[in-house]
Amino acid sequence: NKYNIYFAYEDMNVVMNILKQNNAEQKNQIFDLNCQIEVLIDKRNTTKFESSIPPVSTIRIEFVGEE
């Protein structure tokens, strides 16, 4: 499954740890004041991935589609 993750630059370490824990494959990325990473998550790990996103208002995920 493909997701976009939007986050503030100061949350970079949190997001990178989440991606590492979920064996996410990074595709496109933009690192600026506001950051975006497109990732692929194995379908078997989507629930774990979605629940691992902390309830921080500066981190948001968006399901893009299946791949």
Question: Can you describe what each PLM-predicted range is?
Answer:
Residues 1-2, 22-25:
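A broad, low-specificity signal for short, low-complexity segments enriched in glycine/proline
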Residues 39-42, 46:
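Terminal, non-globular segments
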Residues 5, 37-39:
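A structural signal for short, well-ordered beta-strand segments
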Residues 25-31, 56-67:
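Conserved short beta-strand edge segments in small beta-sheet-based binding/regulatory domains
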